[in-house]
């Protein structure tokens, strides 16, 4: 949201459905999905940065997969499609096919993890 607000400020003459309203991350993804060019640009920049970060993590840890959770994961393919493409751009060849998926526990993952720690394995 902070980056989108900055992009709006830097592009005062560019039309955007988010201009002049209070918005959340979900609104940025919805606007991008609906064809808003400035929102799509922000999603592309964000997924590029995240893809680069995941590629760096993959280079040092060789994970079986990346699971993206929280509210942002509900954005669906408007998030995951460009993220996967950017990731493949930055990842070493041996890591390029590492799956990037939405976490199935959503926002409750922390609660489940805490309970498991308390109860024990």
Language-model segments: residues:
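ATP-binding/phosphotransfer module of carbohydrate and carboxylate kinases, centering on a glycine-rich
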Residues: 1-121
